[in-house]
Amino acid sequence: MQIHKLCFLVLFLANAAFAVKFNFDSFDGSNLLFLGDAELGPSSDGVSRSGALSMTRDENPFSHGQGLYINQIPFKPSNTSSPFSFETSFTFSITPRTKPNSGQGFAFIITPEADNSGASDGGYLGILNKTNDGKPENHILAIEFDTFQNKEFLDISGNHVGVNINSMTSLVAEKAGYWVQTRVGKRKVWSFKDVNLSSGERFKAWVEFRNKDSTITVTLAPENVKKPKRALIEAPRVLNEVLLQNMYAGFAGSMGRAVERHDIWSWSFENAAKNN
């Protein structure tokens, strides 16, 4: 009995050492790594972006960058084990600076390296490039919020959300929007509401991974709307071979010929290492 208690305590303490939790209501730069053109949004650019994390700069053609949490985050007890459950949420806005076109979008990313020196702009979203796109050794998860239809990546539209594994071609993609449940008589009915990602409005996204069934879900809604009970995307069994023991998490974004701003206004993250 005592041995069982001791084993449980050792396991609990070991898992607690892996636990990570943070919540940024705004950013001051002290807990972030800025790669490429990523920066804290200046208050002097006419769109009141002070305190936002931005991946691109208007003055730089084909701008791209990454903003990552300063420390690596444990996603597995070891490289050969199953991933911890985790959940993250963030508010963002995408604002076109040239009309009528927008592009290209941004993504929440989990990546093994804090290095975007080989990343490309345009449809590669500042994450990958033509040479390494699609390679399993990338070990990259990207939840993309895409505002330009790149046919070479089989994009379903110029306004969609996708789950990408080691590639800019989405494993699963859905048009941008959210589900609303209403009561019609005695029945509950789901209806879908479209949103325009590049409207300049603020949206909130939730990304959750469940260890018990290896499923990742993505949920989206306008900032002032309560989290929908139905996810926009549900992708099963995609992360076991992708995630490594320690990785970086954050955001990447890029522009093509059209100029748009990608601003992250708040961000929270928690892994469930202490509960595994």
From Swiss-Prot:
Region listing for Legume-lectin like, in residue ranges: 20-270
Keyword Chloroplast: no
Listed CDD domains: lectin_legume_LecRK_Arcelin_ConA
Signal peptide bounds: 1-19
MF terms (GO), sorted A to Z: carbohydrate binding
Induction data: By oligogalacturonides and chitin (e.g. chito-octamer and crab-shell chitin CSC). Accumulates upon Hyaloperonospora arabidopsidis infection, during both early and late stages of infection.
Keyword terms, alphabetized: Apoplast, Glycoprotein, Lectin, Secreted, Signal
Entry's transmembrane regions: none
Glycosylation sites: N79, N129, N196
Principal localisation: secreted
Cell compartments where the protein resides: Secreted, Extracellular space, Apoplast
The keyword Cell division belongs to this UniProt entry's keyword annotation: no
Similarity annotation: Belongs to the leguminous lectin family.
Classification via PANTHER family: CONCANAVALIN A-LIKE LECTIN FAMILY PROTEIN, LECTIN-LIKE PROTEIN LEC
Protein name in the entry: Lectin-like protein At3g16530
Provenance organism: Arabidopsis thaliana
